[in-house]
């Protein structure tokens, strides 16, 4: 597993809920690939999760993946909260159903196929790759707004 792939991901929503989009900038060495899409009625958090899911789904073989996201929701969910949710039957600490559990379950399964680490980047702060992911997410949302 010597291939390291960087996934720069972002989600966007025009209204929350409303038309939304997701974007992924994939980088492997000097190679880059852009992915984006959207939905007519969604939330910003669903689009943030979908961006990571779509990036991971596009990988053809097991590899080391560094996911760079501006979403504390996604990063904290995968690094801290998901273990408790799974133990509690997909309920939060306050016994409420986990929001977006369909996407969390899909993301959890995809992460298990790779060696994944998570990096948080400040959004809208001039981080070039995050800005590109944001542009892609907005392109995805524009298809539905």
Curated annotation (Swiss-Prot):
For this protein, the record's InterPro entries field holds: RNase_H (IPR050092), RNaseH-like_sf (IPR012337), RNaseH_domain (IPR002156), RNaseH_sf (IPR036397), RNaseHI (IPR022892)
| Primary site of residence | cytoplasm
What does the record list as coiled-coil region(s)? none
Q: Where are the transmembrane segments?
A: none
Please give the name of this protein. Ribonuclease HI
List the source organism: Neisseria meningitidis serogroup B (strain ATCC BAA-335 / MC58)
- Which Pfam family is one of this chain's hits? RNase_H
Q: Which Gene Ontology cellular component terms are annotated?
A: cytoplasm
Q: Which gene encodes it?
A: rnhA
**Which EC class does it fall in?**
hydrolase
Q: So which domain of life are we looking at?
A: Bacteria
Q: Which SUPFAM superfamilies match?
A: Ribonuclease H-like
Residues given in the record as Mg(2+) 1 binding sites: 10, 48, 70
Q: Catalysed reaction per UniProt? A: Endonucleolytic cleavage to 5'-phosphomonoester
Q: Which family does it belong to?
A: Belongs to the RNase H family.
Which cofactors are reported in the record for this sequence? Answer: Mg(2+)
């Amino acid at each position: 597993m010597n291939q390291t792939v960087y996934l720069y991901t972002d989600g966007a929503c025009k209204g929350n809920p409303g038309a939304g989009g997701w974007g992924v900038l994939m980088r492997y060495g000097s190679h880059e690939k852009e992915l984006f899409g959207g939905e007519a009625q969604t939330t910003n958090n669903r689009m943030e999760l979908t961006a990571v899911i779509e990036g991971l789904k596009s990988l053809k073989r097991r590899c080391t993946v560094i996911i760079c996201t501006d979403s504390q929701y996604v990063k904290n969910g995968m690094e801290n909260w998901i273990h408790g949710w799974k133990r509690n039957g997909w309920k939060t600490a306050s016994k409420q159903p986990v929001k977006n559990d369909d996407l969390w379950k899909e993301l959890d399964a995809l992460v298990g196929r790779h060696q994944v680490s998570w990096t948080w980047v400040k959004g809208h702060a001039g981080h070039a790759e995050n800005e590109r992911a944001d542009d892609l997410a907005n392109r995805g949302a524009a298809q539905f707004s």
